[in-house]
């Protein structure tokens, strides 16, 4: 027996010493350079900061940047727009000066480019203050649209009298009108109808677009066509059918064949390092202008990929290489406008900054018909409303379920699934969907079911699918006290819009509505709101607010930029050196031992990345009386209800924690559950006579960065509460962590957090749990692990 104990002690100590040695050596390791396609959010932020600093240095004393006389205010408006999207607020001195300059410009000499860029800058900065200038520019742009001849619906450089439109001027005019409509300025439906006809007539037989009719397609103009078709369709009021005061949700929706042809064509021609054009097209030199068009086409269409190209990552990779290291500028080819650093840098910043907007939701594309997207503008309008409510730029995507991996789905915190008929998902699609939820994703589904639309097939199929994928978690109605009804603003449950949910991963991770929600969402566009009857406006408002609440509940408003989105544990770092890989399992008990199933793995993954050393993230559950327990230097324990160990388990744990083996236990109460906390304290205190629970003092090494961890003197502790207007929120205090320790003969053997770590590690910030913020939960967990490894 003594020999066996000594052997187990040797195994434990060897495991510890191996990783500690690797940690220390890690200080000396040269950091690898990211490979192509592995661009980081940190590198993008630095590039944006450097480009922003360049533009600020180039600003003239009067607030302008180098202008072109034929486009007064154009360059200044472009630079202002780029800086605003890069994160500078309107109150910033540079922005304030540029806005004053823009307001002072003589607007009697307008051009399409300048008026459009000025409108976009003012709409993004101070639309309330400058609404008169915005309206003036809108009226000018509407009057400048060509209304006769083959170029009808397009724009030229200045007046419609020229009768010669081009697709570049036309796209900028539409961008400006769209931004104005978004801030409440009324725009002419006739203008939008003519613009739609114009773009349909401009499309090449291949699906692409050239600079003018008859030109071969180019990259920049095809992107202009994609964006313009989307903008026009969004602003055409006749696409919203209302009969007898009710929305007709099952009416045929515009499925733009022209748009699909353009996107399919572009998937075969995409390039990030040059503007694909015809052989003699001067547009091939306008690379930064082209990339700004790529960003716009990708974002507005909700596409992460064009063909098999991840357009944002490929574009970022190229732009980071092209940025001048000293000045922070980008400079284009000579003898064109992009040779002016302010112009090229502005286009580059617009690509980098707008392209990294957090993805808040993704449409789940399945099947061969369009039932998955019965109301194609619905999610877009919900995201628009959410942006304004949260004062945060957001975007959405579409994922093809036939091709998507779990990691692809995890790029979005919310996956939206809708339909009318049977889902008919394959075994692989079901497995990926199940893994998405168990890996922390949130599924938001609804049936396209309304007075005029039968969605019983989808409703029946979805319920069966949930029962198949989550047999232990039934789909149940969310009662009036569920936080989802209060997550952003208070919404009363309605029999017209009931919500059902499935509990998984510390929260309700699946929400289902048997009624069509997206139909009402698409009616939230300002152009439609003006035409809706009062009762219908209220219905739309309630449906939109419910959608915002679901997004708020699912994300906690804690959204990450594209390149910051999580990946599931993969074999790269953790499995490349199996002989030195540390394995740390989780203890089994009857109090919800695996309810937050991903929390421990996420912490191990974060620690592995922080140390740049291999720690196995393979899920392992082990019983306290398993003979292998002594092989592991550290084990994890959490739960959400009371529990008791058996006499055999108590003896095994006492042996594990003894001075002979010196095992270490890390524990937390899931969602701050008090029953579990009470059980844990009692069960462990009874294991070894003389052991004692005490709060770990703030000056303990575990609370410091001594072991290559973090200073924990101030962390964010969050407590759920309701605001005065009955909105679910939380009270956040800055404090030192409340951690309890079990000391055995003067040695710290168990560290326990009575406040939640697990749900924060699994799903991020929660509206339901008393616990630490997601960032601080990770830091606390890493510190505890590092301390345990040193002991």
Where do the language-model regions lie?
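Helical hinge/lid and interdomain linker segments adjacent to catalytic or ligand-binding clefts
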Residues: 94, 378-464, 468-469, 513-514, ...
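An acidic, glycine-rich "communication" segment
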Residues: 450-549, 578-583, 673-763, 773, ...
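An alpha-helical repeat/solenoid feature that recognizes helix-turn-helix modules
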Residues: 37-50, 64-94, 107-139, 143-193, ...
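Solvent-exposed loop/turn segments at secondary-structure junctions
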Residues: 106-110, 124-127, 147-148, 161-164, ...
């Amino acid at each position: 027996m003594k020999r066996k104990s000594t052997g187990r002690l040797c195994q434990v100590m060897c495991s510890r010493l191996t990783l500690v040695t690797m940690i220390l050596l890690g200080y000396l390791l040269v950091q690898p350079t990211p490979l192509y396609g592995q661009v980081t959010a940190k590198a993008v932020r630095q590039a944006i900061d450097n480009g922003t600093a360049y533009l600020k240095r180039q600003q003239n004393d009067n607030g302008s940047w180098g202008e072109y006389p034929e486009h007064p205010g154009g360059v200044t408006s472009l630079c202002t727009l780029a800086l605003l999207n890069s994160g500078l607020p309107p109150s910033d001195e540079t922005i304030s000066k540029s806005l004053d300059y823009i307001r002072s410009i003589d607007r009697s000499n307008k051009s399409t480019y300048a008026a459009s860029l000025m409108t976009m800058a003012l709409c993004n900065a101070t639309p309330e203050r400058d609404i008169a200038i915005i309206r003036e520019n809108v009226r000018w742009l509407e009057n400048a649209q060509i209304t006769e001849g083959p170029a009808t619906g397009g724009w030229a450089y200045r007046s419609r009298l020229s009768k010669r439109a081009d697709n570049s001027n036309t796209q900028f005019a539409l961008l400006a009108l769209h931004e104005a409509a978004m801030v409440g300025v009324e725009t002419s439906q006739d203008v939008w109808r003519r613009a739609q006809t114009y773009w349909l007539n401009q499309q090449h037989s291949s699906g692409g677009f050239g600079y003018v009719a008859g030109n071969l397609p180019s990259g920049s103009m095809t992107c202009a066509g994609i964006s313009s078709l989307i903008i026009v369709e969004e602003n055409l009021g006749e696409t919203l059918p209302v009969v007898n005061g009710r929305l007709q949700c099952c009416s045929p929706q515009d499925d733009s064949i022209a748009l699909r042809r353009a996107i399919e064509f572009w998937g075969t021609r995409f390039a990030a390092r040059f503007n694909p054009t015809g052989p003699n097209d001067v547009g091939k030199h306008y690379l930064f202008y082209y990339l700004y068009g790529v960003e716009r086409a990708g974002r507005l269409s909700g596409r992460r990929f064009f063909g098999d190209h991840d357009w944002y990552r490929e574009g970022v990779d190229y732009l980071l290489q092209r940025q001048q290291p000293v000045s922070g500028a980008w400079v284009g080819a000579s003898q064109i406008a992009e040779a002016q650093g302010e112009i090229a840098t502005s286009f580059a910043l617009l690509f980098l900054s707008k392209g990294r907007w957090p993805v808040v939701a993704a449409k789940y594309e399945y099947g061969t018909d369009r039932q998955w997207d019965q109301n194609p503008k619905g999610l877009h309008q919900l995201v628009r409303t959410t942006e304004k409510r949260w004062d945060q730029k957001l975007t959405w995507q579409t994922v093809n379920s036939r091709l998507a991996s779990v990691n692809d789905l995890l790029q979005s915190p919310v996956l939206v699934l809708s339909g009318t008929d049977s889902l008919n998902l394959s075994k692989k699609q079901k497995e990926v969907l199940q893994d998405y939820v168990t890996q922390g994703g949130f599924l938001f589904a609804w049936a396209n079911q309304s007075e005029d639309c039968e969605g019983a097939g989808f409703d029946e199929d979805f319920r069966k699918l949930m029962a198949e994928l989550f047999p232990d978690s039934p789909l149940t109605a969310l009662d009036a006290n569920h936080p989802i009804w209060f997550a952003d603003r208070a919404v009363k449950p309605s029999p017209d819009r009931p919500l059902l949910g499935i509990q998984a991963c510390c929260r309700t991770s699946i929400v289902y509505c048997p009624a069509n929600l997206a139909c009402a969402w698409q009616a939230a566009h300002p152009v439609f709101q003006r035409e809706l009857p009062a009762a219908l406006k209220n219905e739309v408002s309630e449906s939109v607010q419910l959608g915002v609440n679901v997004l708020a509940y699912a994300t906690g408003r804690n959204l990450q930029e594209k390149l910051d989105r999580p990946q599931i544990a993969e074999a790269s770092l953790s499995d490349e050196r199996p002989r030195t890989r540390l394995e740390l399992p989780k203890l089994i008990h009857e109090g919800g031992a695996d309810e937050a199933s991903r929390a421990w793995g996420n912490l191990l993954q974060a620690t592995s990345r922080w140390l740049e050393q291999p720690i196995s993230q393979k899920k392992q559950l082990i019983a306290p009386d398993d003979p292998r327990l002594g092989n592991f230097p550290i084990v994890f324990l959490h739960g959400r209800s009371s529990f008791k160990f058996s006499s055999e388990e108590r003896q095994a744990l006492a042996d594990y924690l003894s001075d002979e083996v010196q095992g270490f236990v890390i524990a937390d109460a899931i969602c701050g559950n008090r029953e579990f906390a009470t059980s844990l304290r009692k069960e462990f205190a009874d294991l070894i006579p003389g052991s004692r629970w005490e709060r770990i003092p703030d000056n303990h090494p575990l609370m410091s960065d001594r072991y290559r961890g973090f200073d924990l003197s101030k962390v964010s502790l969050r407590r759920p509460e309701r605001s005065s207007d009955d909105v679910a929120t939380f009270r956040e205090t800055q404090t030192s962590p409340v951690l309890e320790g079990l000391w055995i003969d003067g040695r710290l053997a168990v560290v326990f957090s009575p406040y939640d770590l697990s749900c924060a590690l699994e799903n991020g910030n929660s509206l339901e749990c008393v616990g630490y913020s997601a960032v601080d939960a990770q830091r606390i967990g890493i510190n505890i692990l590092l301390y345990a490894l040193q002991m």
